[in-house]
Swiss-Prot record:
SMART domains: Glyco_32 (SM00640). The active site is at residue 31. It comes from Arabidopsis thaliana (Mouse-ear cress). One of its GO terms (biological process) is carbohydrate metabolic process. Keywords: Apoplast, Cell wall, Glycoprotein, Glycosidase, Hydrolase, Secreted, Signal. This is Beta-fructofuranosidase, insoluble isoenzyme CWINV6.
C-alpha cells in the first residue's frame, strides 16, 4: 500500500510541475540574482543547491540560464561556485551592474572560511566578448566589503545593483540588521573605482522592528509614463523605490533621493505589518529587478517557495521556481507600483475562448470556462456591478477583521461577493483555488478586497493552505473590476485591475490535475454581478532549462 501511495504522489508531482515558469530540472532554487541583458541575451542567475532539493548553508552556487525572450531558457554551466577563502561556504545573492564601457560586473555575498562570515565579493567575466558569459573570475583583491562593527557577521548580504551619483561615484546598498536589535537597514557604500568601497556614516534607510533586510533593491521610476529608466537616472521626472525582503514579504517604499546629500526621503517607513506596500500579497520573496534597455522597461522576478513538505520535495526531486517576469511602473497616483506579465508571455497563448456579451451571475451561480486546458491557461475577466447606493444598514468594513474579509466562505459585511474565478478545480469542486473579490462599505463609500484562498486547493495533507488578500485602490461605483490569472499546474499568478494588486498562490491539487482540472467563474454573494467580458487561452509549454549545455 505504501508503494502505491508513493507512486501516486510521484505521478501527481509530474502533473504539478509547471510548464512555462522558470525552474531548474532538478534540486533546489531560491533567490533570482543579477538579471541583465548582454549582447543579445537575457541572463538570469539564481541561488541553487545542485545536490538536493533543499536549502544548504554550505553549498549554494549560482545557477545560470540565458534567453532571447525571457520565456524560453537554456541552462548553462554554474556561474559562481565556492572556491576561495572569501566564499568557500557558499555564493549567496547579489546583483549585476553594467559599467559605462559595457562590461558587466557582479557583486555577491560570499560566506567566508571565518565562521561563514558574510562578505561582499566582486566577480568579472573572463571573456567580455562571449555573449553567454560562461566564465566568471574573482579578483584577488576580494572581499571588497565586510560587516561593520554594529552589524552581526551573519546579517550583511545581498548587494544591490550599483548606480552613479552626480559626483561620478558608484553607490550600492547592502541589506543588514543592527546588532542586538530588530532594526533592519540598507547600508550605503560608495566607490570611485568599483574596488575600494567606503561605508557612508548612516544607512540610506532603517526601520525598527523589521529584522534583517534581505535582497534589497533601489531604483528610479518615472512619474511621467510607463517606460523604465536606467538605474543611475535621477532628475525631477523620477522618484525612487527601495524594496526590502523581510517577514516573508517583499515590501517597498517610495520617496525622493538626492545623491548630493545621500538623503532618501521616503513617504513612509516600513512597519512589518499589513500596512506596508507589497509587490505581491501571496507566496513571493527575494525579488530582483533590472532595467531592460532593449524595450525601456523595468522587469522584476520573484522566488516562489514550495508549500508542501520537505519529504515531498525529495520525492519530487525539485523545489522552488520563479514568478513570470513582470514589468513594473508607477501608478498614476504616484503612490504605488503597477505590475503586469511581460508581453512576451502572450506568445504562449494558443487555443482561445471568449464571451463578448454581458452575462449576469446571480447568487450561487457557477459557469465553466470550457474549451481550453484549464491546468495551463491565461484568463482575463471583467465584472461590472449594478448601481451602489449608500446604505447605512450595511456593516462598515472597519468592523470586520482581515480573516473574515479574506475568507472565501464568508460574505459578512459584503455588498457584493465573493465573486471571481475557481482555478485548478475538480469537477465536484472539492478542490479549488478561489481568486475573488468582495465589495464592502467603508466610511461614506465602498472598497474592494481581492483575495486568493487556498483552503480547498488540495485534498492532500501536509500542505500549507493560506488565504491571501489586499485592498484594491479603486472606486467600484466608477470603475470595472478586472482579473487576469495565469495558471500553470501548481502556481496561479493573479493580477487585479490591470496590476494594481498581485497575489501568487502555490498549490498542489490531487484531483484537479492535467485534463481533470476545471476553471469556473462564480458568484457566491447575496447580490448579482455582471460579467462584461471574458477571454481565456490554453498556454503552450515554454522551453525551460530542458536542454542544459554541460
Amino acid at each position: 500500500m505504501a508503494d502505491v501511495m508513493e507512486q501516486n504522489l510521484l505521478q501527481t508531482a509530474v502533473l504539478n510541475r509547471t510548464s512555462f515558469h522558470f525552474q531548474p530540472q532538478r534540486n533546489w532554487l531560491n533567490d533570482p540574482n543579477a538579471p541583465m541583458y548582454y549582447k543579445g541575451f537575457y541572463h538570469l542567475f539564481y541561488q541553487n543547491n545542485p545536490l538536493a532539493p533543499e536549502f544548504s548553508r554550505t553549498r549554494i552556487i549560482w545557477g545560470h540560464s540565458v534567453s532571447q525572450d525571457m520565456v524560453n531558457w537554456i541552462q548553462l554551466e554554474p556561474a559562481l561556485v565556492p572556491s576561495e577563502s572569501f566564499d568557500i561556504n557558499s555564493c549567496w545573492s547579489g546583483s549585476a551592474t553594467i559599467l559605462p564601457d559595457g562590461r558587466p560586473v557582479i557583486l555577491y555575498t560570499g560566506l567566508d572560511v571565518n565562521n561563514k562570515q558574510q562578505v561582499t565579493v566582486v566577480a568579472e567575466p573572463k571573456d567580455v566578448s562571449d555573449p553567454l558569459l560562461r566564465e566568471w573570475v574573482k579578483p584577488k583583491y576580494n572581499p571588497v566589503m565586510v560587516p561593520p562593527s554594529n552589524v552581526p557577521f551573519n546579517c550583511f548580504r545581498d548587494p544591490t545593483e550599483a548606480w552613479k551619483g552626480q559626483d561620478g561615484k558608484w553607490r550600492v546598498l547592502i541589506g543588514a540588521k543592527e546588532k542586538d536589535t530588530e532594526k533592519g537597514m540598507a547600508i550605503l557604500y560608495r566607490s570611485d573605482d568599483f574596488v575600494q568601497w567606503t561605508k557612508y556614516p548612516v544607512p540610506l534607510l532603517e526601520s525598527e522592528g523589521t529584522g534583517m533586510w534581505e535582497c534589497p533593491d533601489f531604483f528610479p521610476v518615472s512619474i511621467t509614463g510607463k517606460e523604465g529608466v536606467d538605474t543611475s537616472v535621477n532628475n525631477a521626472s523620477v522618484r525612487h523605490v527601495l524594496k526590502a525582503s523581510f517577514g516573508g514579504n517583499d515590501c517597498y517604499v517610495i520617496g525622493k533621493y538626492s545623491s548630493e546629500t545621500e538623503d532618501f526621503s521616503a513617504d513612509y517607513e516600513f512597519t512589518n505589518t499589513s500596512a506596508d506596500l507589497r509587490y505581491d500579497h501571496g507566496t513571493f520573496y527575494a525579488s530582483k529587478a533590472f532595467f531592460d534597455s532593449v524595450k525601456n522597461r523595468r522587469i522584476n522576478w520573484g522566488w516562489v517557495i514550495e508549500t508542501d513538505s520537505k519529504e515531498d520535495d525529495f520525492k519530487k526531486g525539485w523545489a522552488g521556481l520563479m514568478t513570470l517576469p513582470r514589468e513594473i511602473w508607477m501608478d498614476t497616483s504616484g503612490k504605488k507600483l503597477m505590475q503586469w506579465p511581460i508581453e512576451e508571455i502572450n506568445n504562449l497563448r494558443t487555443k482561445s475562448v471568449s464571451l463578448d456579451d454581458c452575462y449576469e451571475f446571480k447568487t450561487g451561480s457557477t459557469f465553466e470556462i470550457s474549451g481550453i486546458t484549464a491546468a495551463q491557461a491565461d484568463v482575463e475577466v471583467t465584472f461590472n456591478l449594478p448601481f451602489l447606493e449608500n446604505n447605512p444598514e450595511i456593516l462598515d468594513a472597519d468592523q470586520v477583521d482581515d480573516a473574515t474579509l479574506f475568507d472565501r466562505d464568508s460574505s459578512v459585511g459584503c455588498v457584493y461577493g465573493p465573486f471571481g474565478l475557481l482555478a485548478l478545480a475538480s469537477s465536484d469542486l472539492s478542490e479549488q483555488t478561489a481568486i475573488f473579490f468582495k465589495v464592502i462599505r467603508r466610511g461614506n463609500g465602498y472598497a474592494v478586497v481581492m483575495c486568493s484562498s487556498e483552503k480547498r486547493s488540495s485534498l492532500r495533507d501536509n500542505i500549507k493552505k493560506s488565504s491571501h488578500g489586499a485592498f484594491l485602490d479603486i472606486d467600484p461605483r466608477h470603475e470595472k473590476i478586472s482579473l487576469r490569472c495565469l495558471i500553470d499546474h501548481s502556481i496561479i499568478e493573479s493580477y487585479g485591475v490591470g496590476g494594481k494588486t498581485v497575489i501568487t498562490s502555490r498549490v498542489y491539487p490531487k484531483l484537479a490535475i492535467g485534463e481533470a482540472a476545471k476553471l469556473y467563474v462564480f458568484n457566491d454573494g447575496e447580490n448579482g454581478v455582471i460579467m462584461t467580458s471574458l477571454e481565456a487561452w490554453s498556454m503552450r509549454n515554454a522551453q525551460i532549462n530542458s536542454n542544459p549545455t554541460y
